[in-house]
Regions:
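Single conserved hydrophobic/aromatic residue that forms the stacking wall/gate
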Residues: 1-8, 12
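Aromatic/acidic polysaccharide-binding cleft in carbohydrate-active enzymes
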Residues: 13-113
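Catalytic cores of transferase enzymes with a strong primary signal for eukaryotic protein kinases
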Residues: 69, 99, 106-154, 178-179
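Catalytic cores of secreted or luminal carbohydrate-active enzymes
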Residues: 77-123, 195-222
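Carbohydrate-binding surface patches
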Residues: 79-82, 87-89, 125-166, 196, ...
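Active/binding-pocket-proximal capping segment
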Residues: 96-98, 104, 108, 162-171, ...
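Extracytoplasmic
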Residues: 156, 167-173, 181-346
Length: 346
């Protein structure tokens, strides 16, 4: 386990996996809502660095130490769906009964201990709320875990198209916090959540849909660190106009400073139109490589004056199953990336 803050610069790089199986991502937790919210915020866009027996450690659990009941549900539920190590940080001889019941919730613990070991990632961010999802039980299966998370201080309305979750047909739902089945949904999931609350769901669809959109914030960035010791370090940055409210900035400039998506899925393979949405800027180039094949070099990505986002479309060939897409620019800066979408060429 890596806990020294000086070591956390390494924690999201491949070499850390040779040292430990988990790493702290933040300063120490406190039994306060602001601390819980801060740590979740730190981990929202680090899913690419978890899995395969290695995890982002969100620190010990402060259940039973003064948080409100709904805040404790957020705390434990989000630690579970994000596959954080679970370490009890309270006195079990004095813990309130309701808090102890939450800690003993077998369905949430099973979610945390799911054999796939994946961390949920953000697929939607609207109205101050976040929607996170991950595969459980079987990769690319029909069962997924979903969190509707409202960190704000007011009521939040959620409207989540099932296509965003890659789920088709009638979808069965179970509330893992309350441990009860909910009415099945089809088309769109609509919910209203109070402040500082979460809804953790096990969802089972009739059909698993092929993904269409891949956000930049899902990508693995080998040069990323969050210590803030160097200027112009590649990072996940907020952008209101971006499809998921985030972009990847400071991409390129050297060969190793790339963004990589290693689970770009195609059911049957074939030719696709890939449309990259980016922030236009003068003197930027973008190199795209799929499955280590010959790269595609895009130039003249300046766009027009005042343009917030621009897009460019290329044709790529995908193999059946998972594909690796890498974007960067070895000799100059690349544009900031919002997302890319895929459309099968018939």
């Amino acid at each position: 386990h890596l806990c020294d803050r000086r070591q956390r610069q390494m924690c999201i790089r491949d070499r850390a996996k040779n040292i430990g199986c988990s790493w702290r991502i933040s300063s120490d937790i406190r039994p306060e809502w602001g601390s819980v919210k801060y740590i979740i915020d730190k981990n929202l866009y680090l899913s690419a660095y978890a899995g395969d027996g290695h995890y982002n450690d969100m620190d010990m659990l402060e259940i039973g130490r003064g948080l409100k009941p709904e805040e404790e549900e957020v705390h434990f539920g989000m630690w579970c769906i994000m596959s954080s190590p679970l370490l009890i940080g309270c006195d079990l001889t004095t813990i309130p009964e309701a808090s102890l019941k939450l800690l003993k919730n077998k369905e949430l613990i099973a979610l945390n201990q799911d054999p796939l070991g994946l961390q949920a990632y953000v697929v939607q961010h609207e109205n101050k709320g976040y929607v996170l999802v991950k595969d459980i039980e079987q990769e690319r299966g029909k069962v997924r875990a979903v969190a509707l998370y409202n960190p704000s201080d007011s009521i939040c309305d959620f409207s989540v198209p099932m296509s965003v979750l890659e789920m088709g047909g009638k979808v069965k739902m179970r509330d893992l916090v309350k441990q009860k089945d909910l009415k099945a949904v089809q088309g769109t999931l609509n919910r209203q959540l109070p402040a500082h609350s979460v809804l953790i769901l096990r969802m089972e669809a009739e059909q698993r849909l092929e993904p269409v959109r891949y956000e930049a914030e899902w990508a693995y960035l080998p040069c990323f660190n969050d210590l803030g010791l160097r200027p112009k370090t590649i990072l996940y940055a907020p952008m209101k106009e971006a499809s998921g409210g985030m972009k990847v900035s400071y991409l390129g400039g050297r060969a190793e400073n790339y963004a990589e998506w290693n689970k770009v899925y195609s059911e049957k393979g074939g030719m696709y139109e890939m449309t990259i949405q980016y922030v236009p800027h003068a003197d930027r180039k973008l190199e795209i490589r799929v499955n280590n094949e010959k790269s595609i070099l895009l130039k003249d990505l300046a766009g027009t004056d005042g343009q917030q986002l621009a897009s460019v479309t290329v044709q790529v060939r995908l193999k059946p199953g998972n594909n690796v897409v890498r974007m960067g620019s070895p000799y100059c800066w690349a544009p900031d990336i919002d997302c890319f979408t895929l459309k099968k060429i018939e």
